[in-house]
Amino acid sequence: MSRVALYPGSFDPVTNGHVDVVRHAVVLCDQLIVAIGVHPGKTPLFPAGERLAMVRSVFAPVAEKAGCAFDCTTYDDLTVAAAQKAGATILIRGLRDGTDLDYEMQIAGMNETMAPGVHTVFVPASPGVRPITATLVRQIAAMGGDVSAFVPQSVASSLKTKFAG
């Protein structure tokens, strides 16, 4: 039986924290699907197509190195519904701290009620990436700060281009 996991998020932009979660996730499953949430009420910094390309270029080599099949997609419905549509039985969620855990436990409980066959697996962030959030990365980049310690090099370049001029 193939273990399919879905790792949902906005990935706006991809951070080293996301990469850390993927490095742990690819050893837990046979196929990892990264699902980018597209929400009508939100205006992301990077459009969905750019985020898909970013996710693919950063995460596919990590999955390949681990021998894990990889795919990425977008979704605009409930995360648990996206998992079911993708045939995933595992939802991967990264945890930075206790606040994340409290929030994610509530969601995991609701998801378990809606889709008993989809199980949430929490991946604790490595100490070096715990403080990183995409929101802070966007703010630092928007103010001309150096984000190279917080994101993959290709993402740092994309952010620099996005905020140039």
UniProtKB/Swiss-Prot annotation:
GO biological process: coenzyme A biosynthetic process
Membrane-crossing segments per the record: none
Domain of life of the native organism: Bacteria
GO cellular component: cytoplasm
Site residues by UniProt (Transition state stabilizer): 18
Sequence positions that bind substrate: 10, 42, 79, 93
Cofactor entry: Mg(2+)
GO molecular function terms attached to this record: ATP binding; pantetheine-phosphate adenylyltransferase activity
InterPro entries (alphabetical): Cyt_trans-like (IPR004821), PPAT (IPR001980), Rossmann-like_a/b/a_fold (IPR014729)
Subcellular location: Cytoplasm
Main location: cytoplasm
Keywords associated with the record: ATP-binding, Coenzyme A biosynthesis, Cytoplasm, Magnesium, Nucleotide-binding, Nucleotidyltransferase, Transferase
Catalysis: reaction(s): (R)-4'-phosphopantetheine + ATP + H(+) = 3'-dephospho-CoA + diphosphate
Functional note: Reversibly transfers an adenylyl group from ATP to 4'-phosphopantetheine, yielding dephospho-CoA (dPCoA) and pyrophosphate.
SUBUNIT field: Homohexamer.
Family to which the UniProt record says this protein belongs: Belongs to the bacterial CoaD family.
Protein's recorded name: Phosphopantetheine adenylyltransferase
Organism encoding this protein: Nitrobacter hamburgensis (strain DSM 10229 / NCIMB 13809 / X14)
